[in-house]
A protein has these predicted regions:
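Noncatalytic, basic helical substrate-engagement surface that gates or grips nucleic-acid strands
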Residues: 2-148
Length: 149
């Protein structure tokens, strides 16, 4: 099989992609609610598809309590991360409203992705990077080019 015939799978650490878009894109709905997580994620996806021309796209989300196993092995796991600083010129939501909006945008993004030819994977207590590592080793994707984001 030549490189031009080689199939390509796009494996996306979805929460990472979504949070980057959420933090950086200050877009608002007509009602003034932040929507940059959705808009930015879809724009990033559009660019990734255009640039990599994948045969399959898989969004892998961190499962609920995904970090707990690693945190139990290493109490400092992810402890050195800086707090999120949003790219917003106007703070129109309380911290609680901001958290609700962040979750709402993520759920809406997942709904939108369900309408596309995209597989989404969420496994309780497993982080996305572990699932991505597993998928790269599965027989289905043997011989495929893997694009990991």
């Amino acid at each position: 099989m030549t490189n031009t015939e080689q199939k390509r799978v796009l494996l996306i650490d979805s929460l990472n992609l979504y949070l980057r878009a959420y933090i950086m894109d200050p877009s608002l709905t007509m009602q003034g609610e932040p929507c940059g997580g959705i808009k930015g994620s879809l724009k990033i996806l559009q660019k990734l598809v255009r640039d990599s021309n994948p045969d399959e796209i898989i969004f892998i989300w961190d499962g609920p309590n995904g970090s707990q196993k690693r945190k139990s092995l290493n109490k400092d796991y992810k402890s050195g991360r800086k707090p999120i600083r949003l790219n917003r010129s106007v703070k129109n939501l309380t911290d609680e409203e901001e958290m609700q909006n962040k979750v709402w945008q993520q759920m809406r993004l997942m709904e939108y992705l369900n309408e596309m030819p995209i597989m989404q994977i969420i496994i309780p207590e497993v982080e996305a990077d572990d699932v991505i590592s597993y998928l790269t080793q599965t027989p289905k994707y043997r011989g495929w080019q893997k694009v990991i984001v």
